[in-house]
Design a protein with these regions (language model features):
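Adenine-nucleotide phosphate-binding core of ATP-dependent small-molecule kinases
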Residues: 237-266
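Glycine-rich phosphate-binding loop of actin/hexokinase-like ATP-binding domains
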Residues: 1-4, 92-97, 143-208, 307-310
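Conserved phosphate-binding catalytic cores of ATP/NTP-utilizing and phosphoryl-transfer enzymes
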Residues: 48-64, 132-169, 174-179, 185, ...
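Short, small-residue-biased leader/transition segments that mark boundaries at the very start
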Residues: 2-9, 341
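Conserved ATP-utilizing enzyme core subdomain
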Residues: 194, 201, 205, 210-243
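N-terminal glycine/serine-rich phosphate-binding loop of ATP-dependent small-molecule kinases
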Residues: 11-147, 279, 295-309, 329-335
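Phosphate/ATP-binding catalytic cores across multiple sugar-kinase/actin-like superfamilies
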Residues: 48-57, 255-277
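Glycine-rich phosphate-binding loops at beta-strand->alpha-helix junctions
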Residues: 1-3, 130-131, 259, 272-298, ...
Length: 341
């Protein structure tokens, strides 16, 4: 009899593998959020809106006349833009500073100088970011500007009448509330990474994914896990619990993208109602290059926002615009011979 029972219960490896595969499709007990894209039409409309040009990007070929350099020296990266008199970007750079922002800035200036055609020159320069003072002094730049003002000027150029600017980088996050062209309030997060890009980078690595693969997985999610808005330490336990309950990698990735945005909105900005953001919202910073984060932001705030095609360069662009704004024909321009490093 025992032999008959064994025969009836015997299963092939293929049967077992199929059962395991079917487990993936079982609904998890963990609460879920709306999918980032309920329909393919939603995805197509999103792509059409966010993959268009906002700032014209040209080249140095045939460039003539005065040009204006903006350098944004961040904690780990350095960004630079060179704009012409029409405010078009003709050269840009986004790179890590490799622990020496001043050396990185010098290399940027040297690259530009070597590529500038005859008849074109750097008429005025401006620095912003964490390393504003160091770069301004070390390179003998014309001026520095606080990064909030640099980001505002860049956003205003992209979306005139901007009412809110949200900038999420790898390590920090900035929020500007603007009314009638005046910055009303500022919120900055520099203590916790749970509302920043490094939060996602950490979890992507723990899942064995590149950030690009992580983003694609999130975009393909059908039942994003509701992981709440918690710090990185506690989020680890939430993710492990969701995995135990059968949540897919895609649904966890999307849930983490939602969490980053919720942390930014409700813990840093302390938003009570999405109407507080106003009607013209510009998002920028490297983290918003992640389409899943951008989409989660739109769904949570119930509004379409503008992500410039230079989302990671907006501080540098605003600094370049500042340099152009303060330019006069009597300025000497940037003298590379003064730089010794």
């Amino acid at each position: 009899a025992a032999s008959d029972v064994y025969k009836r219960q015997a299963r092939t490896c293929a049967d077992i593998l199929k059962s395991l595969e079917d487990l993936k499709n079982l609904p998890a007990n963990t609460p879920t959020m709306p999918p980032l894209f309920p329909t393919e039409a939603d995805r197509e409309a999103f792509n059409k809106r966010h993959h268009r040009e906002h700032v014209h990007i040209g080249t140095l070929e045939g460039a003539q006349g005065p040009h204006f350099l903006g350098i944004d020296a961040g904690s780990t990266t350095i960004k630079a833009t060179l704009v012409n008199d029409d405010r078009e970007i003709v050269w840009s750079s986004y790179a890590t500073n490799e622990g020496s922002p001043l050396t990185a800035a010098v290399n940027i200036v040297k690259q530009i100088q070597s590529q500038l055609p005859e008849g074109a020159w750097i008429a005025r320069s401006c620095a912003t970011g964490y390393g504003e003072g160091l770069i301004t002094t070390g390179l003998h730049l014309d001026e520095g500007v606080v990064e909030t003002m640099a980001h505002y000027r860049g956003a205003e150029m992209v979306s005139p009448g901007v009412t809110a600017v949200i900038d999420i980088g790898g390590q920090d996050m900035k929020y500007l509330a603007i009314s009638d062209g005046v910055i009303d309030s500022i919120a900055v997060n520099e203590a916790c990474s749970s509302g920043c890009g490094s939060f996602l980078q950490t979890f992507a690595q723990s899942m064995g994914l590149t950030i690009e693969e992580f983003t694609q997985a999130a975009l393909n999610s059908t039942h994003p896990v509701d992981l709440g808005s918690r710090c990185t330490v506690f989020m680890n336990s939430s993710v492990k619990q969701a995995q135990k309950e059968g949540a897919s990698m895609e649904d966890i990735a999307a849930g983490l993208c939602y969490s980053v945005v919720r942390n930014a909105l409700y813990k840093v900005i302390k938003l009570r109602d999405s109407g507080e953001l106003g009607d013209t919202v510009v998002v920028q910073g490297g983290t918003f290059l992640n389409d899943a984060v951008l989409r989660a932001f739109e769904l949570l705030t119930e509004r379409e926002v503008t992500r410039p095609n230079i989302a990671g360069l907006m501080g540098a662009y605003g600094a370049a615009l500042t340099a152009r704004m303060h330019y006069s024909d009597v300025a000497d321009g940037l003298d590379l011979s003064l730089i010794h490093i």
